[in-house]
Amino acid sequence: MSVVPVADVLQGRVAVDSEVTVRGWVRTRRDSKAGISFLAVYDGSCFDPVQAVINNSLPNYNEDVLRLTTGCSVIVTGKVVASPGQGQQFEIQTSKVEVAGWVEDPDTYPMAAKRHSIEYLREVAHLRPRTNLIGAVARVRHTLAQALHRFFNEQGFFWVSTPLITASDTEGAGEMFRVSTLDLENLPRNDQGKVDFDKDFFGKESFLTVSGQLNGETYACALSKIYTFGPTFRAENSNTSRHLAEFWMLEPEVAFANLNDIAGLAEAMLKYVFKAVLEERADDMKFFAERVDKDAVSRLERFIEADFAQVDYTEAVTILENCGRKFENPVYWGVDLSSEHERYLAEEHFKAPVVVKNYPKDIKAFYMRLNEDGKTVAAMDVLAPGIGEIIGGSQREERLDVLDERMLEMGLNKEDYWWYRDLRRYGTVPHSGFGLGFERLIAYVTGVQNVRDVIPFPRTPRNASF
């Protein structure tokens, strides 16, 4: 007799007539007049629970089995048999049931067996992974993360761990969380009356990172192909379905690569992970297509088969200006494209994923390579039907004099970036990279509308519970 996950039983990886033990939680209990109870037991290894058929001849049937309610944890031992009933191929003919943990009061159990609103589930984030929805999201999140690691490993990339605490603002936007151990009641002041960060833990003003990119570039300029994957932080006071204060970013950096190279890399990566999730999480994707977004599976299938369209920003603006559509946000050359603009291009004009390239320099970051026209930079966004921007990237500015000029234009102190500038002084090389917001990717795959519901414990303005 062996302990096996529910997934192994349901997916036929356990031989019929084998004695097994499964461990998990009760989803439902149903009793028949013939003295037989049916327990739906799940352990999170797959979407569906396994049915445990329990005869009233079990010694603890009246004392324990008939008291089991949703959420109780159990250890069930029995024989795997072909199920005569509808809905499952295999079930367990139970010979023993142990109760590992009771639900104290079934009447007040927050995860009672009924459909809960997504807003309610955010209030009980510590229990919401027990629901069908959040459990499925968690498994898809895992599968996507593993697929990303596999893809980059197969492509010869090295994974680099970049710091969460930094003194540099990658985006130059200033929306950063400060890290400090100073006594807020007795802040040290310098001669100008400003807070003296020399007295702080790191001896300077420090922040939570908004991106691992700058640090990643240093390793790309030594290992050639690297990627970072970890949490990043933005102190944006944005209460929208697309924003989190803490979220995960995947950021590859490639030496000797130009904008076209990383556009191709982005396309190959997305198609790889979408194929992986359709193959490995078919049960969860079926649920999303039935209960969340009917297009969840077909959208990914179309994406995998599609040829990416390519368009310059200038041409994209012309398309939008001449399309006859009245947009909520006006479109003209020099404005950053909004979500409605991006979705029009991907969903209605090209009807395919789109790579928009060569944006105006004034709306992009200092590190993006200035094009020969002096007005645009070698930046790109990948726009996906159904969501808009899913990836943003660029060729990095490898010319020190141009980089310094861009920093000056944006009011940045180049001395704060001395180590980043060193890359341009010692064997500089063309290099490129992009960033993928992991939660937006999960939302796109699952059809879940709000990124707060695809990360275990969302951090948003005025909310850091759990």
UniProtKB/Swiss-Prot annotation:
Keyword line: Aminoacyl-tRNA synthetase, ATP-binding, Cytoplasm, Ligase, Nucleotide-binding, Protein biosynthesis
Stated name of the protein: Asparagine--tRNA ligase
Family statement: Belongs to the class-II aminoacyl-tRNA synthetase family.
Subcellular location: Cytoplasm
SUPFAM superfamilies referenced in this protein's UniProt entry, alphabetically: Class II aaRS and biotin synthetases, Nucleic acid-binding proteins
GO molecular function: asparagine-tRNA ligase activity; ATP binding; nucleic acid binding
Subunit and partners: Homodimer.
Coiled coil: none
Gene Ontology CC terms, in alphabetical order: cytoplasm
EC nos: 6.1.1.22
Catalysed reactions listed for this entry: tRNA(Asn) + L-asparagine + ATP = L-asparaginyl-tRNA(Asn) + AMP + diphosphate + H(+)
Major location (coarse): cytoplasm
Gene this chain is encoded by: asnS
Class of the enzyme per the UniProt entry, highest EC level: ligase
Gene Ontology terms describing biological process: asparaginyl-tRNA aminoacylation
